[in-house]
Amino acid sequence: FGDERNYAGTSFVTLDMFGHYLYGSELLNITYDPTPLAQFATYGFDDEGLAAEKTYIIRNGILTTPLGGALSQARAGLPGVANARATSWNRPPIDRMANLNLEPGNSRLEEMLQAVERGILMKTNLSWSIDDSRNKFQFGCEWGQMIEQGELTQVVKNPNYRGISATFWRNLQQVGNTQELFGLPFCGKGEPNQVIRVGHASPYCLFAQVDVFGGA
């Protein structure tokens, strides 16, 4: 809707894209799920009273469901999720993330490494830059390790990668069969500002044709 464009920018995603837009390869499945007890941003109901449940945001690569609570669902005329959250009694509920997860696939890490002739394994996010339409991006990592002929070799410090959202995700080739849990206690949004917990879960993933740079 553009309600926050002066605070956090807009999005290249528009309402008419849901249900058919190819966001990534058929291996890409993204869920919004506030229900797992082990994750960082878990609840039973949002602050407008909607019951939390696991919902596919992207299924088999297709953009399916927007992140919007009851008010946004009424405005958009589309189904959404239970994500209207307030940080305290003196703030209104606004659309927020909870646990946004990349669902596991069928590949073992060893299989993914063996499929790579020359590449790099990156871990631990260090820096980020995203344009104001949430389309072009650049991320830096603390640590990387070269992959050569299917084998992990030398360690690389501070590698970076960049791309365009749909192009990047359409080049997803394999998804790992186990997830690692992540989370933050201080995700900020809104005016006046509201800080809440958010969570992520992700397996290892293999991408082709990624623009990698930097590192030492």
Regions found by a protein language model. Give the residues of each.
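N-terminal small-residue-enriched
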Residues: 1-216
